[in-house]
UniProtKB/Swiss-Prot annotation:
It comes from Praedatophasma maraisi. Myoactive. It comes from the Eukaryota. Belongs to the pyrokinin family. Keywords: Amidation, Neuropeptide, Secreted. It is found in: Secreted. This is Pyrokinin-4. Its main location: secreted. GO terms for biological process: neuropeptide signaling pathway. The modification Leucine amide is found at L13. GO terms for cellular component: extracellular region.
């Protein structure tokens, strides 16, 4: 997975 370091707030639960 290529996710930017910063968009890790509020995971899709």
């Amino acid at each position: 997975a290529e996710l930017p370091q910063g968009l890790w707030v509020r995971p899709r639960l």
